[in-house]
């Protein structure tokens, strides 16, 4: 299990690197679009659409790695206010709810992407793309998030009985 967790960590780091590169490319594209419009060269027509799709992909690429590192949005003031054992149980409850939600998104995302693929649906904006290209990353990202919730539960089971210390607390 430790080897799988280590391999998975490398995968998530690679995905976060890809998200950073995509963010850089999007920033350069937006800057170039503004520059071209200001000098009268007409801009980059699909820049808005590419920016929208990039933000979506950046989110899906970065989310599993951020969850693993404890850098996701987390309000843990209640966990710090209750007894250690109850905080630990609430951590479990949060992880179970997160796992179930992610698995539902995997199922739903895969269903929608498959339906789009078999129907031949097309997204027509500035660019014309098969719709499933935009939908396919969602179930993959949520499957990785579900796997991370599994690893989180494994780490929680073997840790001291108390809330995690992997987040910045308001207390």
Residue ranges and their predicted role:
Residues 1-171:
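Alpha-helical transmembrane segments and membrane-interface helix-loop junctions
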């Amino acid at each position: 299990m430790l080897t799988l967790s280590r391999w998975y960590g490398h995968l998530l780091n690679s995905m976060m690197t890809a998200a950073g590169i995509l963010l850089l490319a999007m920033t350069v594209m937006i800057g170039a679009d503004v520059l071209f419009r200001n000098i009268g060269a007409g801009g980059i027509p699909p820049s808005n659409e590419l920016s929208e799709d990039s933000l979506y992909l950046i989110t899906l690429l970065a989310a599993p790695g951020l969850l693993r590192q404890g850098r996701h949005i987390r309000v843990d003031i209640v966990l710090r206010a209750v007894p250690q054992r109850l905080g630990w149980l609430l951590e479990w409850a949060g992880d179970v709810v997160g796992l179930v939600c992610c698995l539902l998104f995997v199922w739903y995302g895969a269903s929608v992407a498959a339906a789009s693929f078999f129907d031949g649906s097309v997204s027509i904006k500035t660019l014309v793309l098969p719709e499933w290209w935009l939908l396919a990353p969602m179930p993959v990202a949520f499957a990785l998030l579900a796997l991370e919730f599994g690893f989180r539960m494994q780490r929680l089971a073997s840790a001291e009985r108390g809330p995690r210390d992997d987040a910045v607390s308001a207390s």
